Amino acid sequence: MEKVIELKDVWVRYGNQTILEGINLELKEPNGLLGIIGPNGGGKTTFLKVLLGLLKPYRGSVKLFGKPPEKSRELVGYVPRYKGFDFDFPISVWEVVLTGRMSHTGLLKNYREEDRKAAEDALKTVEMFEYRDRQIGQLSGGQRQRVFIARALATNPKLLLLDEPNSGLDPHMQDELYRLLDRLKHKMAIIMVTHDLSAVSVYVDKIACLNRKLHYHNSKEIPIEDLEATYQCPVELIAHGMPHRVLSNHEGNP
């Protein structure tokens, strides 16, 4: 079976500062949701950029679907944090989602019928097709996030990467977002980085902890030692609201 992701001893530096240290990760399943948790500044966004081929490690190897990331981009959808997005810019939902097809059409080429069909299917998947003519700035935060996910889905990805997709959403919108991802994970592999410990304990299939080093055991359970090492504080301060079954020690005992 072709591996979705294979990282071997990956190290990343900014200047003299090590951001990622000795990362090893292997995902074989073509579907499912992996949640990656960790503190601010722990390297989660950097990790996604490495998978996208936007950052090259100074040591180690990265492969997506058996190829280097730069040769696998058409197979990957990405939903970044849109901190600097100007929501007053006059662009419609439909136009936003169509831009997701640029990896197939090129920057200056016209959209084809297959591109429009892919955009339509993506909007229907996230239940936003009826809003296609709305300006993006007229939508709620949860609706915008669905549109950005549709933009990523328009590429027909085998792997979907999401960077803090629940950021800025109220609890109801977050719940809708997670239910959407719960449906999508049966069609593709998904990696989501987040601070929301309670959400990952409910919706993800597997969990990894990242704070420069990656702790991953191919399981939904998080060894208490890994959680404390990642957040550098006692588990009682960070695991409030997490189901007890999610936490384990390295011997597998509750």
What kind of region is each of these model predictions?
Residues 1-30, 86, 108:
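A short, flexible loop at the N-terminus of ABC-type nucleotide-binding domains that lies
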Residues 52:
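Helix-to-loop junction immediately C-terminal to a conserved catalytic motif
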Residues 60-72:
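Conserved ABC transporter NBD signature motif
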Residues 98, 113-131:
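Conserved ABC ATPase "signature" region
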Residues 111, 135-139, 143:
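Conserved ABC ATPase signature
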Residues 160-164:
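Catalytic Walker B motif of ABC-type/P-loop ATPase nucleotide-binding domains
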Residues 222-254:
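ABC ATPase nucleotide-binding domains
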